[in-house]
Amino acid sequence: MNAYQNKNITIIGLGKTGLSCVDYLLSQQANIRVIDTRKNPTGIDKLPQNIPLHTGSLNQEWLLESDMIVISPGLAVKTPEIQTALKAGVEVIGDIELFCRAATKPIVGITGSNGKSTVTTLVYEMAKAAGVKVGMGGNIGIPALSLLNEDCELYVLELSSFQLETTYSLKAAAATVLNVTEDHMDRYMDLEDYRQAKLRIYHNAKVGVLNNEDRLTFGENENQAKHTVSFAENSADYWLKTENGKQYLMVKDEVILPCEEATLVGRHNYMNILAATALAQAIGINLDSIRTALRHFKGLDHRFQLVHQANGIRWINDSKATNVGSTVAALAGLYIEGKLHLLLGGDGKGADFSELAELINQPHIICYCFGRDGALLAKFSSQSYLFDTMEQAIEFLRPTLQSGDMVLLSPACASLDQFASFEKRGEEFTHLAQCLT
């Protein structure tokens, strides 16, 4: 008999992840109930009709009758109803924990405030280039449990802090916390609380890949890898060499690739490449395969993506910059001949925007702020304009553009105050860029 057969298991949250939990636990002959706090959740039409469903609130009675609760990453474990169930002895886990208990092949785990989707996809492409049967999922693409249906020799998972909160059995072959900057401060008590959730990725990991420029990424206590390697611009195992005006991606004394041969550009992307290379080498991927992937990888949509270029003006969609750290990374080391027209705003999730002040208060940077926290952001720039919407901002700035200028959407905020997702925000920016120029 398997561990879940005839167990009473309540799944909280529908959508892709919740449905993957339903499918998996049905295959394990568990007795399932589903709760979603939304009145009309997405995925309701795909739920088998014989599965009991409660919507609109958390059903405390169902929770207390459960042997196990599989909680959506979108719901905090600190929620009173969940705490009541925990105190009654009910086990609370997430879909990643279910996956880790079932997976029999090595797992690469990637988390961080910024860059994790790029690094996850890079490691996936590196493994593919080496001929490895690899599955990618978690917080990107398909839910992790769906990967169990594929013929995989390796799993590469992007993991959020929310997912890691309820994961106990990861034991990654290689893991990294890319960086730690303020994000989701509406969910965590403080930065340290958020950091501790991230560090769980190192628990029982074979190799930890550390960012030598950010000591907050270093594991501690029980959350440490057995062996570590590091990446940074200088003084690390994986580093960036500058010689005769050219830059090279390095591992120790060996050249991985001249930066000019990589399709990704910008210092923050070079750090992403170094982290991905370290993870790939930790699981035995050879450098030739890594080089092949780096020469062909085109980057991800909405991540510092050139979406339009005309009359010497570049339009960059960095809508995935949903927190301050991501926008700081985009601005660091950015060279522009003319003016930078920076679009900022949305839902700041309680973040401290002051870190942006020094970067954006420069003669060549003009800020156009919009959305729920637009007024807060506008205060940090002496050259700022305030609008209700991004479209209004773009219509205003368009006539001022000159050759050599860049229009950059890197909002430092979530999108949900005005858009269905950061993708929708990026798509609107791209549409406006292409229509208005």
Curated annotation (Swiss-Prot):
Chief place where the protein resides: cytoplasm
InterPro entries reported in the protein's UniProt record: Mur-like_cat_sf, Mur_ligase_C, Mur_ligase_C_dom_sf, Mur_ligase_cen, MurD
Catalytic activity: UDP-N-acetyl-alpha-D-muramoyl-L-alanine + D-glutamate + ATP = UDP-N-acetyl-alpha-D-muramoyl-L-alanyl-D-glutamate + ADP + phosphate + H(+)
EC number of the protein: 6.3.2.9
Listed GO biological process terms: cell division; cell wall organization; peptidoglycan biosynthetic process; regulation of cell shape
A GO term from the CC aspect: cytoplasm
Pfam families: Mur_ligase_C, Mur_ligase_M, MurD-like_N
Single GO molecular function: ATP binding
Alphabetical keyword list: ATP-binding, Cell cycle, Cell division, Cell shape, Cell wall biogenesis/degradation, Cytoplasm, Ligase, Nucleotide-binding, Peptidoglycan synthesis
Residues at which ATP binds: 112-118
Compartment(s) where it occurs, according to its Swiss-Prot or TrEMBL record: Cytoplasm
Pathway(s) of this molecule: Cell wall biogenesis; peptidoglycan biosynthesis
Annotated function: Cell wall formation. Catalyzes the addition of glutamate to the nucleotide precursor UDP-N-acetylmuramoyl-L-alanine (UMA).
Family statement drawn from the similarity comment of this UniProt entry: Belongs to the MurCDEF family.
HAMAP family in UniProt: MurD (MF_00639)
Name of the protein described by the UniProt record: UDP-N-acetylmuramoylalanine--D-glutamate ligase
Source organism of the structure: Haemophilus influenzae (strain ATCC 51907 / DSM 11121 / KW20 / Rd)
